[in-house]
Regions:
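Bacterial N-terminal signal peptides that target proteins for export
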Residues: 2-13
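C-terminal motif of bacterial Sec signal peptides marking the signal peptidase cleavage site
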Residues: 21-24
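Bacterial signal peptide processing site
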Residues: 26-29
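Short coil/turn motif common to extracellular beta-sandwich-like domains
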Residues: 33-46, 158-163
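Structural motif
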Residues: 42-53, 167-175
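Post-signal-peptide N-terminal segment of Sec-exported extracytoplasmic proteins
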Residues: 46-78
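Short, low-hydrophobicity acidic/polar segments
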Residues: 66-160
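Short helix-loop boundary/capping segments
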Residues: 167-202
Length: 202
């Protein structure tokens, strides 16, 4: 009698565990089947003879409330990314720069490039490091359709840093061991999506 009662009590337990496992598998399939489309990105660096970047960062900012931000890194020549279908704003910029830093990258309108502060001859001076070459692609409206074939995007990054040369005449050079100079009135940063420099000068 005791044997029969134990069997009747224990049989439902394995069935209950199996139900939990199957439910977890079904949920996993829903996540794995989230629809994405391929985006084949090709970058044209014509005219960039020196200091070609090794890596670029690509960000798709959703313009729909239910969309998801997609962030990835590609070789300088480009590559393929997987993006859910939808409407996006898009940013591409050269990555792994020594001086240029990025902040505010949670939104298309706030992502900003800048350089860190540095200490000049006078500790009270407000100075920043000179930026290296920085290239950007900013697209306000990109539609990613649901498709089995990859969408092809051919992009040409734009240089957003200007270079200037200065000649300094020094008298009595035999008595000088070093010369330090700096330029004032420079912009403190650059908004990638808005294509605007910050108003604050350094």
């Amino acid at each position: 009698m005791n044997v029969v009662e134990n069997i009747r009590y224990n049989v439902p337990l394995p069935l209950f565990c199996l139900l939990i496992i199957l439910s977890g598998c079904n949920f996993r399939e829903v996540l794995d089947d989230y629809p994405v489309s391929g985006v084949q990105i090709t970058l044209d660096w014509t005219g960039v003879a020196e200091n070609l970047p090794e890596t670029v960062r690509v960000i798709f900012y959703p313009k729909d409330a239910e969309g998801r931000k997609v962030d990835g890194y590609l070789p300088a020549a480009g590559g393929e990314m997987k993006v859910p279908p939808g409407n996006y704003a898009m940013i591409v910029y050269n990555y792994s720069t020594e001086c240029v830093c990025i902040e505010g990258d949670e939104c298309y309108g706030t992502i900003r490039a800048y350089t860190e502060r540095c200490i000049g001859m006078d500790a009270g001076e407000d100075m920043i490091w000179s930026p290296e070459d920085f290239y950007v692609v900013a697209l306000d409206d990109v539609e990613i359709a649901k498709s089995e074939a990859a969408m092809v995007m051919k992009l040409k990054p734009e240089r957003v840093v200007s270079s200037y040369s200065f000649a300094v005449k020094v008298d009595g050079v035999e008595n000088i061991s070093a010369v330090v100079c700096y330029v004032s009135g420079l912009n403190g940063g650059y908004f990638l999506g808005r294509r605007l420099c910050t108003l604050a000068e350094v």
